[in-house]
Amino acid sequence: MPKPRTKRGHGREEKKRKRREEAESYEAHENDSKRQRTTDENGYQDGQEAQENGIGEKEFFGMLADEEQEYFRRADELLELNQFPSDEERDVFLENVWKEAENKELKLASSQSCSRLMERLIQLSTTAQKKRLFEAFAGHFLSLVQHRFASHCCEALFLRSAGVVTKELSGFVGFVLDTKGAGGDAEKPEAAMEHLFLATLDELEGSLSYLITDRFASHTLRVLLLVLSGRPLEDSSSRTLMKSKKKEKISVSGAEAADEANKGLRAVPPSFTMAATKIIQDSTAGMDATSLRVLARHPMGNPTLQLLLELDLTLNKGEQKADAERPTLLFQLLPGAPKSLSDGSSEASEFINGMIYDQIGSRLIETLITHAPGKVFKALNQNIFLPRIEGYVRNDVSSYAAIRVLNRLSKDDLVQAVEQITPTVPQLVTKSRFNVLKTLFERCAARGANDEIKKLNKGLKEGCGKTPADLVTYLCGFKDEEKKKKDVQQLSKNEYAIQSHGAQLLTALLSIPGPVKGVQESLLAVEPTVLVRLATTSMPTVTVLTTALATPSSNPAFHKSIVSSLLPHIHELAVQQFGHNLINAIAEVPSKGKERSVPFHMKEAIMARLGEHEAELRDSWMGRSVWRNWKGDMWKTRRRDWKVWMREVDAHIESTLPQRGRAAEKQQAAQDKPSKKEEPVVEDKMEVDEVVEKPEEEKKKEKKDKKDKKEKREKKEKKDKKEKKEKKKSKPEEAEVVAEDEE
């Protein structure tokens, strides 16, 4: 029998109704296209009684009571603050929250205010707790992955459980698990994580074709594919595919240590590889050329299609050769490839030509270029990309696909491409295609195309300006600052991207013999205010200066001049978000050396300025980082030890920097090798090994040598003093002879 409606109950229902109406109006105002989070009286989410394509119905899991909602909200705050007296008390608190959440997992996951708590609990959960959550979600995954908040909980659960699968491959023992915490009657054998993932896939099977384009489920599906494939989950490319840019980052203290098992490449069972292959087949089964083109241009479908294509090209390469009759996704996109690509009117050629200039579709072309088999890429390059490479690099959209092409070209094809592009380099500079120029310089350096580097460098200088200083000021966007802006926000966003690309180009040039000299001359020619702006504008711009300090120069005064220009602003840079990296980099430059050095007296002056502003430095984490790296406390209390430490740093850097290696050491290393033919290769390896494996031994050896020299010097001084005393006591005749000899 239902309880009679009381006055208090009626008031509570009225409050809930008002909250629902407020949430609906807020959501409608914020974004009309967003699905509503509130519930209607019929038990389904408002406006979502059925799927958009008419398949299936949305489930409603109920709402938490006000007291429960308040408890979980408070628990979320406590976890975020992490102010527990000890780890034991924190573990007890987590256990209590899990007990309170029992049988409420679905409500928590689909709650706007409590889904964050569920994500944090998943990040800190044990293997048994993850498996309980899989069982709690079982049978409802199709609805959960399409829910605005629950989909994030599913993603977190899949990501954090990936490492458990790999761990269980080495040997899984199914312990008896009390899933309900109700005693011996409710105990049952613990399921393997592999089986739980496969059961989840069984629920989603049959719905994959429309989940690909779902606003929330598409992200969850990508996460599931990455877990099944065994790919690293922390890669930047993987993160871009998995998460929306707008997604809130939910983190909790202790999650990184718990997530250690999920990092890097993971071994996966054969069933996962088969499941990933089946998802690829089922997702695009029955799609014709038109459907694939629509999917390739879809904002949600394109990233999923990218991942499907990449996995299709990388998984089971050997099996694809044996099963050539089966149409893969690659040949669905490019029918008849590679032969059909020679015909400009073929379906495959039209697909490439239509997608490469599309803002969304071009991303699929990038994936295709990167992972296509050699025969297909060769046909693409010879028939489509190489003949039109000059036009592709000039376009804002197709230039990204052109960069992927340049990264795969052989030396001969690269030289041919550079010959086409070289006359338009000044135009590329004007259009701010700095990322294209960076790729050209890097690939020419990697392929040993030195003549092409000279041509590109000449065109770059023509495009930037006549004076040496123009190279840095133009590429970093410090010219024409007074130009009026129409859309301030959009322009500032675009300008930041252009500035980053320009700074990355300068950083790349500093590692290439030839262009490095031009960048160093430009840095010497700019005003000190420009150097300060480089140090404080962004991470890419300050990286230009830190890389310049780490790079040897034929000009002995280069590093000294840069530091001298920055000296009046040292304390300001030390407390700046980006500038403190530069101050830390100065400490690593040796005090002596022909190619790279900052005099010791200049380092003392820097430390003195930092000491004057010690209180200011200690007020910020950037300043504390600088004070710690420069050993400010040692400088205050033990000045002599600080000087010894700084000289030790110099000696350590001198012996471990390959680019500054002393000629004597190189000759000795070469003499120790048995064969002259192997000298250059082995010599390089020895220098790298010295950096990685033997710094401590060298440091001990240098200390011992210094100690021996000091002892010898002291003995010699004592001997000289003794001789002088003996001479004074000697006969007058001998003293006269000594005086005559001195005259």
UniProtKB/Swiss-Prot annotation:
Residues 20-40, 673-685, 691-700 have a biased composition (Basic and acidic residues). Its main location: nucleus. Pumilio repeats lie at residues 100-135, 203-243, 347-382, 565-608. GO terms for molecular function: RNA binding. InterPro entries: ARM-like, ARM-type_fold, NOP9, Pumilio_RNA-bd_rpt. The keyword Manganese does not apply. One of its GO terms (biological process) is endonucleolytic cleavage in 5'-ETS of tricistronic rRNA transcript (SSU-rRNA, 5.8S rRNA, LSU-rRNA). GO terms for cellular component: 90S preribosome; nucleolus; preribosome, small subunit precursor. It is found in: Nucleus, Nucleolus. SMART domains: Pumilio (SM00025). Residues 1-19, 701-730 have a biased composition (Basic residues). Keywords: Nucleus, Repeat, Ribosome biogenesis, rRNA processing. SUPFAM superfamilies: ARM repeat. Residues 1-56, 656-743 are annotated as: Disordered. Belongs to the NOP9 family. RNA-binding nucleolar protein required for pre-rRNA processing. Involved in production of 18S rRNA and assembly of small ribosomal subunit. This is Nucleolar protein 9.
